[in-house]
Curated annotation (Swiss-Prot):
Protein name, entry field: Na(+)/H(+) antiporter NhaA
Recorded superkingdom: Bacteria
Paired cysteines (S-S): none
Gene3D superfamilies referenced in this protein's UniProt entry, alphabetically: Na+/H+ antiporter like domain
Catalyses which reaction(s): Na(+)(in) + 2 H(+)(out) = Na(+)(out) + 2 H(+)(in)
InterPro entries referenced in this protein's UniProt entry, alphabetically: Na/H_antiporter_dom_sf, NhaA
Gene Ontology cellular component annotations, sorted alphabetically: plasma membrane
Pfam family, one: Na_H_antiport_1
Family from the record: Belongs to the NhaA Na(+)/H(+) (TC 2.A.33) antiporter family.
Amino acid sequence: MLKQIQKFLKLEAASGILLLVSALLAMIFANTDLNQLYFSFLQTEVAIKFGAFSIDKPLLMWVNDGFMAVFFILVGMEVKRELFEGSLSSYQKAIFPAVAALGGMIIPALVYWFINQNSPEYQQGWAIPMATDIAFALGIVALLSKQVPPALKVFLLALAIIDDLGAIIVIALFFSHEMSMQALTIASIAIVILVAMNRYKVTGLINYAIIGTILWASVLKSGVHATLAGVIIGFCIPLRGKNGEAPLHHLEHALAPWCSFAILPLFAFSNAGVSLEGMSLDKLASPLPLGVALGLIIGKPVGVFLFSYVAVLLGIAKVPEGINLKQIFAIAVLCGIGFTMSMFIAGLAFGEEDASESVLALARLGILMGTFVAAIIGYFLLKITTKPSLMKAA
C-alpha cells in the first residue's frame, strides 16, 4: 500500500488529481448531512497570542491567509528563478508568454465586466477569471505527457508564472483594506532586513523563517493581504550563497511537495464546498456565476491566443520552436482552469460583504463550472493537436 502511495505521489498528474478529489469531497460534505460539521469546522476560532499581540481568526482564514502565504513563498521563488535563470531570463524567452499572459488577464476581466456592467454589487469580482491554476493545468498536461512537446510545457509554465505575478499585483493594488501605519512600519523594517540578508547572501533559512514570520504577521495586521508577505519572502531567498550553496533551490524543492499535496488540496477542500440548497437555474445563469464561467471558458482562451497571434503577426514575438499555434490554442483553453487561484481572489472580492455567503457561493459555482468545462475541452484539444500525425503535418 505504501509503495502504491509513493508511486502515485511521483506522478506529474498527482497534484491535479488530488486537487480535483479535494474539491469533490468539499462538495459532498457541503451538500449532505455532513454540511453542518463541514461549515462549523471551517468557522472554528483559532487564536495565537504573544504578549499583547494576538491573531484570532476562523480556521478558514488561517488556511487562506496563513497556509496560502507558504504557497506564495513558493510562487515568489519560482518567479525569481525563472526571471534570473529560466524561461523568463531574456527578452526573447519572456516576450511570447508575457504577451499571452497579458491577454489572458485583460480579456477575461472585460468579459466579466461586460456581463456584470448592470450589476454594481458584483463588479468587484472582475479579477476572478484572470487567474490560472498552474497545478491543475499541469496535471491535465501530465495526463498526455508522452505526446506533449517539452516546449509547450515550458510555455504553459512561463505563462502561468507571469499570470501569478499579475494576480499578485492585482491583489496588492485592489484588495487591500484600511492601512495600519504601525504595522506597515514593522513590515517595512522586516523587508529591509530580508533584502539585506539577500544582498549579503545569508543562507541560513531559519533567519528567513524568523524575519518572514514577523513580516507575515505585520502585513496581516496592516490591511495589506498577508499572502503578499509570502511573495516578498520568496523573492528574498538567495539563488546562490557565498560558498556556492543554492538555498532557493533547496527550499523550493522542500516546499513544493507540501504545497502540492497538503496546502493546495486543503485550500481546495476549505473553499470549494458550495451548498446547492436553494440554487436554481436562474441563479446559475445570473451575472456573477455567468461572468466568472464565461470569463474562464471564453475570455481566457480568446485573450491568450489572440494576443499571442497578434504578437507573432506584428513580429513582436515568435512561436517557440517545436510547437504550433493550434497547440497554443489548446493551452489557452487549459488556462481557463482558474480553480484555486480564482477561489482565492473570489474570497478577497466578496469575503467581506454582508451577503458574502450567498454571493461567494455564486462566485465559486461560476469558478467550478468554468474550470470543469475548460479542463474537459482543453484536454481533448491538447490530445488532438499533439497527436504524432498532426505534429508531423505541422
